[in-house]
Amino acid sequence: TMLVGQAQAIEQTFSYLSIFSGIQDLSASSGALSSKSNYFNSLEGEHGNLKESRKVQPLVVGFDFYRASGSVASGFGIEILRYKKLFNFSDGSQLSLEALGVLYGFNFYYRGDFWFPFFGFGTGNYTSKIQEAFYASDSLTESTIFGQVDTPLYYKLGARIPLNSWGIVFSQQFISADLDVASSNKHIALGGTSTLFGLYYGF
């Protein structure tokens, strides 16, 4: 009598809660995604050079749920990010930019022995508040503009390094989220390229 056994990969479900931050460059290319930002360039032509870089520091909270079969896993993720920055021009004009983004999509993991590299892509929503204080002919004009990007696109690459239930996560994201600024009929990039580091808890 001969017994034949069949080995099957056991499916497991995992969830990650993450918090991370880093640098998001609004002027950088969105990788393979298109962008048509020209708002800041137009303002520099009118109000002089921008004194700060177009880099912001977002705070990001993310939740990932995925199913693993062996060393391969796939699932769904959502991230909520927020940033705010004040920009100054050489003629004294100022611009305050505040954005709140919700990004969601699919993630794919490889579960290695010491790290879990991943790739993700998806869409979401951005809302923004722009406060303009611009000088022209010795007079100051102030305005507040609210806007929304309904279908931003993103993709990301990164890895998680598990340390028992906790771990370290780093990610590079490419986001195309161009907002039409009604006051100037120009486009401002709310996305760009971001490099993020943080911690996660798995359960």
Map each language-model feature to its residues.
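C-terminal segment of classical bacterial N-terminal signal peptides
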Residues: 2-8
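Outer-membrane beta-barrel "beta-signal"
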Residues: 16-18, 163, 190-203
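Repeated loop/turn-to-beta-strand initiation elements of outer-membrane beta-barrel proteins
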Residues: 70-76, 114-117, 163-170
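Transmembrane beta-barrel strands of outer-membrane/channel proteins
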Residues: 17-25, 76-82, 119-125, 170-174
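Short glycine/proline- and aromatic-enriched beta-strand/turn motifs that initiate or cap beta-hairpins
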Residues: 8-76, 85
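Residues on the lipid-exposed face of transmembrane beta-strands in outer-membrane beta-barrel proteins
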Residues: 59-67, 102-112, 121-123, 155-163, ...
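Trp-centered recognition loops
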Residues: 150-154
